[in-house]
């Protein structure tokens, strides 16, 4: 499981070094084979290859005539790029994906359980602050049974 927030610098070629604490798990679970794609926010999603393949199998089974499904398939599958950890634990984020997420030098890698999000650091700080200001734990019961069942 991937968790935590990590500030990372991209190198001049657009490579990102995965923090050491995640490398062994990524090498064991997927031999360093990763998939990076666009997220529904202005961020990227980074999956171990087997996790992405499972998501992809589920997405392609959804009704193709549904516009929402088609959009999600186009975004997640259409923009997906396979990448591999090198000997130093780095991988290259393709330029079109860096451009989509406005990634420059400083990025944030956020563990999300079975995947990561990659954000521009300035945009992440701004969005996180907005979400914190909007958050109301008292309103969780109004957000559906899944969120209402959470206990803090």
Swiss-Prot record:
Q: Which InterPro entries match?
A: MraZ (IPR003444), MraZ_C (IPR035644), MraZ_dom (IPR020603), MraZ_N (IPR035642), MraZ_sf (IPR038619), SpoVT-AbrB_dom (IPR007159), SpoVT-AbrB_sf (IPR037914)
Subunit text? Forms oligomers.
Q: What is its main location?
A: cytoplasm
Name the family the entry cites: Belongs to the MraZ family.
Tell me the protein's name: Transcriptional regulator MraZ
Lineage top rank: taxon: Bacteria
UniProt keyword annotations, A-Z: Cytoplasm, DNA-binding, Repeat, Transcription, Transcription regulation
Q: Which PANTHER family match?
A: TRANSCRIPTIONAL REGULATOR MRAZ
Q: Kindly give the Gene3D superfamilies that the UniProt entry links to this protein.
A: Transcriptional regulator MraZ domain (3.40.1550.20)
The keyword Cytoplasm appears for this protein: yes
UniProt subcellular location: Cytoplasm, Nucleoid
Query: What Pfam families does this protein's entry cite?
Result: MraZ (PF02381)
GO MF terms listed in the record are:
DNA-binding transcription factor activity; transcription cis-regulatory region binding
GO-annotated cellular components:
cytoplasm; nucleoid
Looking at the record, the residues that make up the SpoVT-AbrB domain are: 5-51, 80-123
Where does the sequence pass through the membrane? Answer: none
Among the GO biological process terms of this entry, one is: negative regulation of DNA-templated transcription initiation
Q: Give the species this sequence originates from.
A: Methylococcus capsulatus (strain ATCC 33009 / NCIMB 11132 / Bath)
Work out whether the entry's keyword set contains Repeat.
yes
